[in-house]
Amino acid sequence: MADKKVLQLFVPHAVVDGVDVDFLLKALETQFANSKRFEIDFWQCRKDILVGEKWHDSIQAGLAASDLGLLMVSPAFLASDYIGKHELPKFVGPEATKPLIPVGLKPVDFQRQDLKGLKDFQIFRREGKFFTELSSRMQKEDFAYRLYQSMEDRLAAVTANV
């Protein structure tokens, strides 16, 4: 078997969404632990910035070192000035330099809310439902499993010529 491709995924999310993001990332880490093709490091500010470090500098370094973005889309994510000014431009718009995988974490209204450049991208949801719309642990685990499958396909496409 060929060596796994090692990738760092930058995970921008709103601080208030932390509990849901943690659950989803833990489930994804478990799925990717068994991947035949990829070894994934999920970079997120709450675990990768050490006490005493300058958070803006650390976030920008994590963003620069990342291969892709795993964007945790929610109303709070879209409302964040910091995400909008310092993180999203690397993934959408004229300054975009990195591929993205947008995930529907919490419901947003595609018609009524400003999606900050994400309106043209397929946002992952499970059968049209956002992650937090699923009530049982089993449904949330299934969301993570289906997201893992979609991510494997997207990562294979993005890294095909690398």
Which residues does each PLM region occupy?
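A generic structural signal for short coil/turn motifs at secondary-structure boundaries
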Residues: 18-19, 78-80, 133-134
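Redox-cofactor binding/interface segments in oxidoreductases and associated redox assembly factors
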Residues: 71
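Rossmann-like NAD(H)/NADP(H) cofactor-binding core
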Residues: 101
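Conserved N-terminal substructure of TIR/SEFIR domains
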Residues: 1-68, 91-98, 106, 138-162
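Conserved TIR/SEFIR loop-to-helix hotspot centered on a Trp-containing motif
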Residues: 75-96, 108
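Short secondary-structure boundary motifs at beta->alpha junctions and helix caps
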Residues: 124-141
